[in-house]
Amino acid sequence: MDGYRPGLLDRLLGGPPGARFLSQEQVKDSLARDLEVLLNTRTALPQYLLQGYPECAASILNFGLADFAGLSQSGSEDRARICSSVRQAVERHEPRLRNVEVSLAETPGTVNRIDIVISGMLWPHGANEAVSFSAALQPSSLHYSIKRGGIA
């Protein structure tokens, strides 16, 4: 095989003309873009409404994250809740990433910014490579930016 087949979103959006396969680096770039979309989407329903409906909880209906506006990065319970929510969303909606781990990183010199590190194993078509992505939430815009590797 000459590469990896593009994901559904890439095929629907009509990626580069004539590109039937992606390199491993292109897969990582695609994964970073899709993680950014996931983190910048807010769920429509609160989690407690979906507890009795596991199929709905794992569906596109539950795509995205809950709003963290009322949580504090300095509180250990809130930090754990943010990490758990991000990990669950990634595990639920990103099949190319396995063994997902999420942690909050503290970046010296930043105020009111949440930095999240998402790591796991890249898993398209049998590839097995450790990857990490950094997400930075800018409170003024409430927008996450994602980059591969270090702090965004």
Residue ranges and their predicted role:
Residues 1-74, 122-152:
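Immediate N-terminus of the mature polypeptide
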Residues 59-61, 110-115:
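A short, glycine/Asx- and small/polar-enriched loop/turn
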